[in-house]
Swiss-Prot record:
Native organism: Escherichia coli (strain K12)
Highest classification ranks of the organism: Bacteria, Pseudomonadati, Pseudomonadota, Gammaproteobacteria, Enterobacterales
Keywords noted in UniProt: Activator, Transcription, Transcription regulation
Keyword Transcription regulation: yes
InterPro entries: Znf_Ogr/Delta (IPR007684)
Single GO biological process annotation from the record: positive regulation of DNA-templated transcription
Name under which the protein is recorded: Prophage late control protein OgrK
Function comment: Cryptic version of the phage P2 OGR protein which acts as an activator of P2 late transcription.
Amino acid sequence: MFHCPLCQHAAHARTSRYITDTTKERYHQCQNVNCSATFITYESVQRYIVKPGEVHVVRPHPLPSGQQIMWM
């Protein structure tokens, strides 16, 4: 949820689309009937706090019944 820049009421996202792998364009509409402004925001990755290292594939945990999933 984003606040309307004109009246500060809640604005709901109506639709969105990826511009790049790290940037999304989102269309919002103000929920205040007296305003009803429609505006666009951009959401993008600025930096990573933690990046995963090398990922090692492991077997899943056994099911509660004690049975294991068979791999083919």
